[in-house]
C-alpha cells in the first residue's frame, strides 16, 4: 500500500516489471560461466565443429539489450562457428550453406547434396550439452532454430542458436547466418538491434530502456498482443524524431498517443532483412489502437490528478492502465 502516485509507480516497477538486481547478477555470472564451457567444446567433444576465434559467443535478445521483464525465463546466445571455406547461396525464401570437402567436422552434418543441415547442427549442440556441469536437460526449441539448455541450479534456460558470420560484402557489411527452422538458414544481425537500443537509450539519458520494459509489461497483459520484438521497435521508432526527454509519465502518455495511430503504420526491421515487422491483421490493430487510446486518457488524468495532490485518484487511473499489480492507495 502506498500514499503517492510516485511511490506507487516506483513500487510497481521494482516489484512487477524490472528484473531483480541480485537475480540479474547471478544470471550474468551463469551466462559467462556457460560461455566458458561452450568455448571448450571443440577440444572436449568428438567431431564438434571449430568455433570462430574471438567471436565464439554472441549475446542477443532482450536480456542482452536490458529490456527483459519479469520473470527471467530465458537468456539467448549465439554459438558462432568457423565456416572453414563454406559459402552461401541466397534464395528468396532461404539461404543454403555449401560445405567444402575438406571441412571434415561440418561435413558430418550435411545433406546428401553437401549443404549444411541447420537442424543437424542444432542436434549436435544438443547432444554435446550433457557434459556441462549441473546439466538437467536439453531440447530442440519448438521453432527448430535453437537448442534450449536447462541447468539444475537456475530457474532460467539458455536458448543456444548456432551461427556463422559472412565475409563483408562490397559495402563493408557482414551478417550472421542462423537456422530458419526448416533445415536451411537465414540472415540476421543482432549487433544492429543492440546498437540501436543502446544509442537511443543514451540519447535520452538512460531512460528509454525502462520505458520499453514497462510497455512490454503492459503488452503481456493484453488480450490482443504485439510481439515483443515489434513492440520494442515501435517504442524506438517513437523516439526516432524526438530530441529531449519529458519525464517517464509524460513519455508514457506520449507513447500511447503515438501508438493509437502508429499501430496502423509500417514499422520496418532496422536490420533491413525482414521488411515490415507490423504484419498484424486489421482487427488486432484496431483493438490495440482502442486500448492505447484508453491508456492515453487514463495517464493524462493520472498526471492531472497528481498535479492537484489527488494521489488516490491518480493511482486508480494508473491501475486502469497496468492492472491489479499496480499498488493500491493507502488511506
Curated annotation (Swiss-Prot):
Record-linked SUPFAM superfamilies = Nucleotidyltransferase
Q: Name one GO molecular function term.
A: ATP binding
Class of enzymatic activity (EC top level):
transferase
**Transmembrane domains' residue ranges:** none
> Which keywords, in A-to-Z order, does the entry hold?
Antiviral defense, ATP-binding, Nucleotide metabolism, Nucleotide-binding, Nucleotidyltransferase, Transferase
E.C. number(s) listed in UniProt: 2.7.7.-
Which sequence ranges form a coiled-coil region, renumbered to this chain?
none
State what induces this protein: Part of the CBASS operon consisting of cdnD-IK1_05631.
Cysteines paired by S-S bonds: none
Tell me one GO biological process term: nucleotide metabolic process
Question: Origin, by domain of life?
Answer: Bacteria
Family, similarity comment:
Belongs to the CD-NTase family. D12 subfamily.
Describe the function of this protein.
Cyclic nucleotide synthase (second messenger synthase) of a CBASS antivirus system. CBASS (cyclic oligonucleotide-based antiphage signaling system) provides immunity against bacteriophage. The CD-NTase protein synthesizes cyclic nucleotides in response to infection; these serve as specific second messenger signals. The signals activate a diverse range of effectors, leading to bacterial cell death and thus abortive phage infection. A type I-B CBASS system.
The protein's name is Probable cyclic nucleotide synthase IK1_05630
